[in-house]
Design a protein with these regions (language model features):
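Short aromatic-glycine-(Arg/Gly/Cys) micro-motifs in beta-strand/loop hairpins
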Residues: 1-20
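N-terminal cationic leader/targeting segments used for protein routing and processing
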Residues: 4, 30, 101-102
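A short, charged, amphipathic alpha-helix used as a generic interaction element across diverse proteins
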Residues: 12, 25-45
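Residues in flexible loops and secondary-structure boundaries
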Residues: 15, 31-32, 92, 104
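Short beta-strand segments
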Residues: 19-22, 94
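Generic detection of short hydrophobic beta-strand segments and adjacent strand-loop junctions
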Residues: 22-25, 102-104
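Short, mixed-charge low-complexity intrinsically disordered segments
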Residues: 39-104
Length: 104
């Protein structure tokens, strides 16, 4: 069976929301997109996340919750995710993930 790797960006703020799906034939390409999306979110011109203060890779604001899972090694095809939520406004979040799917 063949595999495909779906990179999902799901975001929501008070101003709007959207979901973007991108399908890749290799895990390496999907993982590169996953990391690029996270980097893009850290840019204040692109996302609410970019306006946050960070300390040691974690949001400094206690009302912001970050949960993530990265792949463990270069040969692992982990279904990674990066979820950041404003716990005082659950409508404000960014969720980025890689999903591995088998296709017939």
């Amino acid at each position: 069976m063949e595999k495909v790797y779906i990179v999902k960006l799901d975001w929501s703020t008070e101003d709007g929301n959207d979901t973007e799906l991108t399908v890749y034939g290799t895990y390496d390409k999907a993982y590169a997109k996953f990391k690029n999306l996270i980097a893009d979110e850290m840019n204040p011109e692109n996302s609410w996340v970019g306006n946050l203060e960070w300390k040691d890779g974690i949001p400094a604001d206690d009302k912001i919750e970050l949960d993530f899972l990265d792949h463990r090694n270069d040969t692992d095809e982990t279904e990674c995710y990066w979820l950041i939520t404003d716990t005082w406004n659950f409508g404000t979040h960014t969720y980025i993930s890689i999903e591995n799917k088998e296709v017939l």
